[in-house]
């Protein structure tokens, strides 16, 4: 393969499982991009390369000896720096927590590891996840990989920028009022804010108990679907987490949207949007309708 860092998460995981590429090759390809561009983009604020390389080698050994592999086996990732890992740095984007090392590990991080993925570092974010642009006075602003003077969107700024810049194949973010959706949009990638209670929030810095969600940012919707299959599900350590069975989200991506009704507000939605944004939205609606969805336009009171 010419550029393994350009693979989607699903392509990368499948390539490792088939032996077409090794995990260490994926990791080093991502690091080449990171070393070249992170000084300008500032998406990654700390790394543990030694541990990540050890995890990659262990993943490759598992493939060689034909152990059962998880859905994300051998894929390097990173996380918004508000996910806790026991003994690891978790700054939450603030000088107040510049040396905070929690004693617990987030359920989502553990589930990703059980599926074979490994994280190599913490990603830039708005301080305590509290602004929509991704600016940060302590660790420096995160910049949009496509146009450095532009914002990445926040608060999961490093999550959006790192995936777009091909520093990793997916990143974990959080969304209280748009903090997965905004960076995904601004950085041109795919992001998913799950229905609240679908994914455990245990071990993730709380911002708003009634609004917080955690979820993936990746290159494709299929990538997000595979991650959701791994991280969703009840967690006894998060009493708000739902008990409904977790489907295989990826297998349900048939493209058939019959029976789905999509509401599109005619006000308070695209009122102040630039013309290209409106055009992109309308083009997306045409695609969705072509797949069988019913588009219902309505006015908000």
Label for each model-derived stretch:
Residues 30, 52, 105, 224, ...:
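Residue-level signal for inorganic ion chemistry
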Residues 193-285, 291:
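A short helix-breaking turn/cap at a secondary-structure junction
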Residues 11-18, 97-101, 212-219:
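Short, well-ordered beta-strand elements within core beta-sheets of diverse protein domains
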Residues 1-53, 290-292:
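An N-terminal boundary/leader segment
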Residues 102-234:
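Short glycine/serine-rich loop segments
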Residues 71-108:
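Enzymes and membrane/adaptor proteins characterized by extended Gly/Ser/Thr/Asp/Glu-rich
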Residues 59-75, 223, 253-263:
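Immediate post-signal peptide segment of exported/extracytoplasmic ligand-binding proteins
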Residues 50-57, 116-117, 126:
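Long amphipathic alpha-helix in the N-terminal Rossmann-like dinucleotide-binding domain
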């Amino acid at each position: 393969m010419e550029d393994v860092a350009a693979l989607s998460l699903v392509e990368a995981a499948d390539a490792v499982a088939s032996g077409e590429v090794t995990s260490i090759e994926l990791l080093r390809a991502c690091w080449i991009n990171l070393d070249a561009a992170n000084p300008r983009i500032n998406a990654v604020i700390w790394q543990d390369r030694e541990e990540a390389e050890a995890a990659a080698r262990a993943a490759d050994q598992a493939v060689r000896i034909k152990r059962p592999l998880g859905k994300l086996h051998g894929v390097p990732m990173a996380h918004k720096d508000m996910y806790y890992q026991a003994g690891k740095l978790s700054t939450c984007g603030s000088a107040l927590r510049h040396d905070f090392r929690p004693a617990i590990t987030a359920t989502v991080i553990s589930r990703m590891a059980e599926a074979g993925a490994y994280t190599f570092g913490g990603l830039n974010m708005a301080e305590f996840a509290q602004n929509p642009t991704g600016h940060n006075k302590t660790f420096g602003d995160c910049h949009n990989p496509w146009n450095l003077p532009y914002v990445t969107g926040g608060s999961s700024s490093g999550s959006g920028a790192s995936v777009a810049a091909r520093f990793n194949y997916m990143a974990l973010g959080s969304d209280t009022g748009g903090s997965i959706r905004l960076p995904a949009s601004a950085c041109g990638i795919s992001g998913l804010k799950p229905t609240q209670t679908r994914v455990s929030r245990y071990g993730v810095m709380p911002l708003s108990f009634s609004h917080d969600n955690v979820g993936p940012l990746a290159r494709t919707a299929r990538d997000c679907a595979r991650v959701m299959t791994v991280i969703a599900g009840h967690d006894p350590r998060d009493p708000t987490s739902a008990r409904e069975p977790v489907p295989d989200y990826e297998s349900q991506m048939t493209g058939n949207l019959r029976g789905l009704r999509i509401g599109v507000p005619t006000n308070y939605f695209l009122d102040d949007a630039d013309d290209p944004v409106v055009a992109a939205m309308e083009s997306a609606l045409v695609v969705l309708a072509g797949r069988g969805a019913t588009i219902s336009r309505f006015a908000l009171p």
